[in-house]
């Protein structure tokens, strides 16, 4: 029977791959316990060359496998409103679960294994995260009430029943300010200083500043004079920020006001008026000639001058009065004394001395220079490291054998003395015997070299195998 090709269970060309990812925090089903928290995300098969060509259109020239186009967003075009179906989480027990059909393969999967089509603008984690810092979009009164700084017992903080009508009415201060603005606009650019002084003198009486009741009761006083007296046009600024505290975002409660006052007192010390001496041009005023204060100042001046004066019986050269009287005499009596400073000796305590008597903590040792280890060379013929294995000498049996060879196999013909009456035939025979002996000696020498070489190689291999076996048996 012909062998049939088995059909694969999954066709890679038509297959659809998914990534198992966590459900988005903006997904409405993220808070549903019955819905799975992990969903399937279809993978998009994009050719690398096509993706890189698309990236080059937008100026991305990185040659790697990362998809930089996922960070780009298409510009929003004209938008239109379309009716959307309301999303509702289905109960598995009551209603059947919806199925999603993948058009490329025709696979039907439940919709719960995929992410929701509609997502919220803010995720669950951002909704639960607390907001830190001042909230400028909140009413300061609401912030003060949340911080327990709002005084509910204060009658000024209570609203009347007709607070809307009262808020729409113009108060007396606003009317006064309107009158003041109109008068300021009518004023000319140049003013007479004498007239201002005359007007300002009318605003004060012998008792001091005018109170609010006095201002209201005094007839003929203009709104401008009252405003100048009450400093309506002046705004107190902070020395620290150069801004008025009314422009602050936070409502100033009692503790913050106390904190601001302390800062103001602290920065008053660094005002220009408090630094250095005042100029003489700014000092004004007068004092009587026979006043006690002037007499005390003169007495202090004469007393200080008398202390610095020294009466001399005879005329002497003027010396520096700031120096002490006996300073010159003491300088003459000074002598140079040489002091020898001895080097402080090292003092040993009992514990240090006892430690030198034993080798428990005292380990005297000579520091030696360790030479660099030699490089290991490997034989090209045997593959065994050279000069690593120990060299063995000849055994007693091998030495005895060599001695026997040396005693018995010595060349006899070459050592025999030549006769003086030797004939030509004897000489020719003797030379031929020497040649034969030398030839045999060369053959024997070559055989011995080969035998020793093979024996050396065999012994090196045995030692190497023995060393490997011993290392393998270590525990």
Swiss-Prot record:
Location in the cell: Cytoplasm
Biased composition (Acidic residues): 184-213
Domain of life: Eukaryota
A Pfam family recorded for this sequence: LTV
Keyword Coiled coil: yes
Compositional bias (Basic and acidic residues): 419-447
Coiled coil: 418-475
Keyword Ribosomal protein appears in the UniProt entry: no
Gene Ontology CC annotation, any one: preribosome, small subunit precursor
GO biological processes: ribosomal small subunit biogenesis; ribosomal small subunit export from nucleus; ribosome biogenesis
Positions carrying Phosphoserine: 17, 24, 248, 331, 408
Family of this protein: Belongs to the LTV1 family.
Disease connection: Inflammatory poikiloderma with hair abnormalities and acral keratoses: An autosomal recessive disorder characterized by mottled hyper- and hypopigmentation of the skin, sparse scalp hair and eyelashes, sparse or absent eyebrows, and palmoplantar keratoses.
Protein name: Protein LTV1 homolog
Gene that produces this protein: LTV1
């Amino acid at each position: 029977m012909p062998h049939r090709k088995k059909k694969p269970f999954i066709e890679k060309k038509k297959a659809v791959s998914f990534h198992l990812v966590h459900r988005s925090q903006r997904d409405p089903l993220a808070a549903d316990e019955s819905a799975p928290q992990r969903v399937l995300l279809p993978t998009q098969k994009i050719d690398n060359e096509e993706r890189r060509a698309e990236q080059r259109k937008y100026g991305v020239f990185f040659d790697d496998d990362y998809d930089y186009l996922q960070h780009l967003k298409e510009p929003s075009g004209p938008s239109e409103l379309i009716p959307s179906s309301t999303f509702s989480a289905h109960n598995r027990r009551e209603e059947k679960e919806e199925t999603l059909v993948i058009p490329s393969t025709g696979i039907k999967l439940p919709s719960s294994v995929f992410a929701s089509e509609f997502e919220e603008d803010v995720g669950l984690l951002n909704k639960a995260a607390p907001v830190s810092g001042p909230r400028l979009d909140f009413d300061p009164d609401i912030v003060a009430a949340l911080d327990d700084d709002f005084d509910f017992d204060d009658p000024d903080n209570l609203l009347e029943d007709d607070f809307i009508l009262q808020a729409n009415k113009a108060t007396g201060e606003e009317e006064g300010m309107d009158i003041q603005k109109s008068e300021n606009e009518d004023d000319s650019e140049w003013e007479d200083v004498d007239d201002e002084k005359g007007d300002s003198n009318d605003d004060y009486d012998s008792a001091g500043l005018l109170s609010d009741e006095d201002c209201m009761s005094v007839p003929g006083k203009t709104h401008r004079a009252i405003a100048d007296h009450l400093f309506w046009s002046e705004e107190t600024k902070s020395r620290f920020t150069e801004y008025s505290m009314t422009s602050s975002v936070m409502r100033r409660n009692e503790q913050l006001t106390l904190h601001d006052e302390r800062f103001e007192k602290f920065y008053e010390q660094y005002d220009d008026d408090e630094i250095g001496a005042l100029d003489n041009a700014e000092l004004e005023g007068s004092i009587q000639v026979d006043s006690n204060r002037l007499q005390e100042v003169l007495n202090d001046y004469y007393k200080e001058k008398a202390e610095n004066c020294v009466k001399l019986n005879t005329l002497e050269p003027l010396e520096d009065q700031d120096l002490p009287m006996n300073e010159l005499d003491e300088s003459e009596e000074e002598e140079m004394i040489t002091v020898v400073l001895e080097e402080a000796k090292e003092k040993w305590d009992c514990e240090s001395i006892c430690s030198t008597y034993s080798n428990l903590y005292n380990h005297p040792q000579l520091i030696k220079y360790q030479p660099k280890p030699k490089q290991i060379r490997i034989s090209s013929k045997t593959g065994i490291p050279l000069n690593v294995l120990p060299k063995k000498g000849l055994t007693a049996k091998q030495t005895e054998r060599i001695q026997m060879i040396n005693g018995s196999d010595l060349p006899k013909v070459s050592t025999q003395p030549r006769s003086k009456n030797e004939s030509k035939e004897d000489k020719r025979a003797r030379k031929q015997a020497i040649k034969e002996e030398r030839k045999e000696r060369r053959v024997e020498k070559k055989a011995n070299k080969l035998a020793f070489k093979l024996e050396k190689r065999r012994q090196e291999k045995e030692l190497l195998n023995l060393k490997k076996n011993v290392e393998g048996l270590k525990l």
